[in-house]
A protein has these predicted regions:
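Right-hand nucleic-acid polymerase module
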Residues: 1-108, 118-275
Length: 275
């Protein structure tokens, strides 16, 4: 990625085995759903890190208070909004880039959280008001202590927001997050390592330093072909030295408070049969 390297080590239960996915037979286990949420958060974070900067925008799109919104209307509204927004960007010779998720409040009110590249916020607000009659608030993207976009927390928040609709029978989208097709993915390299190369305290490489706050040694969920079970995992981030040397004091914005994204309290009993 632009400013760092994200390392993810895990044990592969399929190594050296011919294991194929069996057809779905029953509801997806909770552990597997959690794993899929975590994987979606990682992919979403990679796209944010590679395509957005601190000057880009975090939008919150809402509907008028106490106005119930059906999923079909929400889908049509957001599609129409993106079509108008794409046209507005094109007039300024800018290519629209976006990532968004749909959520619901405890009272069932639909809202969207969206990342877009830098643009006139007055135009964006007027377009959404014209389509939905609702409001729009915005901030610049949240930064971390090193002064670059805090893509991990933003991605976690987006996936947490999508859980409010994705696990309902009347879900708005069939995806955990929606993104424009022009987003670039970082280069992903896979390699086999020996057990002795798995250090509890990982070492850095030339030109990078290990972010001590990012080190995680624990367990993740592994599909061994028969059932989902725990496996040993390690995650950490390598920060480019140039970022650390050039960082300045920046005003830090914090995300709204929310429960731990993958805690036991965040799971809804109302799930569709096709999950």
């Amino acid at each position: 990625m632009k400013n760092n390297i994200e390392v993810y080590k895990y044990y592969s239960g399929k190594l050296g085995k011919k294991i194929y996915n069996a057809p779905a037979q029953r509801k997806t286990p909770i552990n597997q759903l959690k794993y899929q949420d975590q994987k979606a958060s990682r992919i979403c974070g990679w796209k944010i890190a590679e395509n957005f900067t601190k000057d880009d925008l975090w939008l919150t799109l809402t509907y008028p208070a106490r106005q119930p919104i059906e999923p079909e209307k929400a889908r049509k509204d957001i599609s129409l909004f993106l079509a108008y927004l794409r046209r507005a960007y094109k007039k300024e010779n800018i290519e629209l880039k976006y990532i968004y998720t749909a959520g619901r409040t405890k009272r069932g009110m639909v809202h969207f959280h969206m990342l877009v590249n830098k643009f006139d916020t007055t135009i964006i607000a007027n377009l959404w008001r014209k389509i939905s009659g609702g409001g729009m608030s915005f901030k610049h993207l949240f930064l971390n202590e090193y002064g670059y976009v805090n893509y991990k927390k933003i991605a976690d928040y987006l996936i947490k927001n999508s859980q409010e609709t994705f696990y309902r029978k009347d879900r708005i989208h069939k995806k955990r997050f929606c993104a424009s097709l022009n987003l670039v993915m970082p280069e992903i390299r896979k390699q086999l390592i020996k057990a002795k190369g798995w250090k509890l305290n990982p070492s850095s490489i030339k030109g990078y330093l290990v972010d001590k706050n990012s080190i995680y040694n624990g367990y993740g969920w592994l599909d061994n072909g028969e059932h989902w079970d725990c496996c040993r995992v390690q995650r950490y981030t390598l920060i480019h030295i140039g970022v650390i040397c050039n960082r300045r004091r920046t005003k830090k914005h914090s995300l709204p408070s929310m429960p731990e994204i993958f805690s036991e309290d965040n799971w809804w009993e109302e799930r569709g049969d096709d999950i």
